[in-house]
């Protein structure tokens, strides 16, 4: 189980990303449309003034049951370890153990 402070930090980043998403997207569109370099620098300054944790690249996918940041499966939202345990206990419908 991940430390609770790390999980809370990640939730805070998600909230910030959602809050500033439209501002960031519109500023990036403006930069591509504006021809003059000085105006591009002004718009870029606006982007830099946004909180660092509001950038989507700062987000990290975590397992929703344990909070583990590594080996996550997007389809399930689980880490590999938790996914394996749940498949063995038949808690995930449609998932089967591989055998060859």
Swiss-Prot record:
Q: Name one GO molecular function term.
A: rRNA binding
The record, for InterPro entries, names: Ribosomal_uS14 (IPR001209), Ribosomal_uS14_bac/plastid (IPR023036), Ribosomal_uS14_CS (IPR018271)
SUPFAM superfamilies found in the cross-reference section: Glucocorticoid receptor-like (DNA-binding domain) (SSF57716)
Pfam families linked to this entry: Ribosomal_S14
Which Gene Ontology BP terms does the record give?
translation
Query: Under the cellular component aspect of Gene Ontology, which terms does the record hold?
Result: chloroplast; small ribosomal subunit
Keywords of the record: Chloroplast, Plastid, Ribonucleoprotein, Ribosomal protein, RNA-binding, rRNA-binding
Q: Where in the cell is it found?
A: Plastid, Chloroplast
Describe, as the record does, how this protein assembles with itself and its partners. Part of the 30S ribosomal subunit.
Function text: Binds 16S rRNA, required for the assembly of 30S particles.
| Similarity section | Belongs to the universal ribosomal protein uS14 family.
What protein name does the entry list? Small ribosomal subunit protein uS14c
What species does this protein belong to? Lotus japonicus
Q: Cite the source lineage.
A: Eukaryota, Viridiplantae, Streptophyta, Embryophyta, Tracheophyta
Q: Which gene name does the record give? A: rps14
């Amino acid at each position: 189980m991940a430390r609770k402070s790390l999980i809370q930090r990640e939730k805070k980043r998600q909230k910030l990303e959602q809050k500033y998403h439209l501002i960031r997207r519109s500023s990036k569109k403006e930069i591509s449309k504006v021809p003059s370099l000085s105006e591009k620098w002004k718009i870029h300054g606006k982007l830099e003034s946004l909180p660092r944790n509001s950038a989507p690249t700062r987000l990290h996918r975590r397992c929703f049951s344990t909070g583990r940041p590594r080996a996550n499966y997007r389809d399930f939202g689980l880490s590999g370890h938790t996914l394996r345990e749940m498949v063995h206990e038949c808690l995930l419908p449609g998932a089967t153990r591989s055998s060859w």
